[in-house]
Regions:
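Short, small-residue-biased leader/transition segments that mark boundaries at the very start
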Residues: 1-3
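Generic hydrophobic transmembrane alpha-helix motif, especially the helices
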Residues: 36-72
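C-terminal transmembrane helix and the adjacent membrane-cytosol boundary/short C-terminal tail
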Residues: 85, 89, 93, 127, ...
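Cytoplasmic-entry segments and transmembrane alpha-helices of multi-pass inner-membrane transporters
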Residues: 11-51, 82-86
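Interhelical loop and adjacent transmembrane-helix boundary motif
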Residues: 140-192
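Transmembrane alpha-helices
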Residues: 106-144
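Hydrophobic positions within alpha-helical transmembrane segments of bacterial inner-membrane proteins
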Residues: 5-22, 45, 49, 121-133, ...
């Protein structure tokens, strides 16, 4: 999760800033936007097959947590990019022209005015993108496998990144397959709580940033 978010978040936000603030409107921007919208709607199992072939076989990572993390990164990257773009478009153009009119550089305007103004929407978009794949299992079955042993030391943790590793949704599937219904329903309940928590966190952070910006 940390690997996925640490890659997808800065790349997605940076891509949205470039497309919205630097790139000239035209065919290139339309193609990129169409591509991101298409990727956002592709079934997760397709990402899983691509991740298995590219990260697992071509790059030689095999069935591992890294392969699964990189695959999930590709899944949420277009979502974060599009959500950030929409958040940036909600900022009035008068903010941009006013800052540039008093001599501020474009990057200074983006860093101090545009991003803080769009932050509620950006945070909401990121959390919703992450929430979409909390219950993901199809892509991970093809890339990360179904291992569930936790590392006991820090060195074992980094070694575990190159080994098979499952998620709660995969364990839910395996438990149902084995007839372990009590375990399966317990995992399902935890997943529901996590999804509800993400939704509440989204609303809380959006209101918090909006209040700080206005006050």
């Amino acid at each position: 999760m940390c690997i996925r978010d640490s890659i997808a978040t800065p790349v997605g936000i940076g891509s949205a800033i470039y497309l919205n603030e630097y790139a000239k409107p035209g065919r290139f921007v339309r193609v990129i936007e169409f591509t991101t919208e298409t990727l956002a709607g592709i079934p997760s199992i397709i990402f899983g097959l691509f991740g298995m072939v590219f990260f697992g076989n071509t790059l030689g990572l095999g069935y591992s947590i890294l392969t699964g993390s990189f695959t999930l990164t590709l899944m949420i990257l277009p979502l974060i990019t599009r959500n950030t773009q929409e958040a940036l478009k909600t900022v009035p153009d008068t903010y941009r022209s006013g800052a540039l009119g008093i001599g501020a550089t474009k990057w200074y305007m983006i860093r101090t005015i545009l991003l803080p103004s769009a932050m509620p929407g950006i945070i909401t978009g990121i959390i919703l993108a992450v929430g979409r794949i909390v219950g993901e299992s199809a892509a991970l079955l093809f890339t990360a496998g179904s291992g569930y042993l936790l590392p006991k030391t820090a060195s074992a943790f980094f070694q575990k990144l190159f080994e098979s590793g499952g998620t709660m949704t995969i364990q839910l599937y395996l438990s149902m397959s084995k007839g372990e219904y009590s375990i399966a329903f317990g995992i399902a309940a935890v997943l529901l709580v996590i999804v509800m928590g993400i939704n509440f966190l989204t609303k809380f952070l959006a209101r918090r940033f909006d209040t700080n910006r206005k006050g």
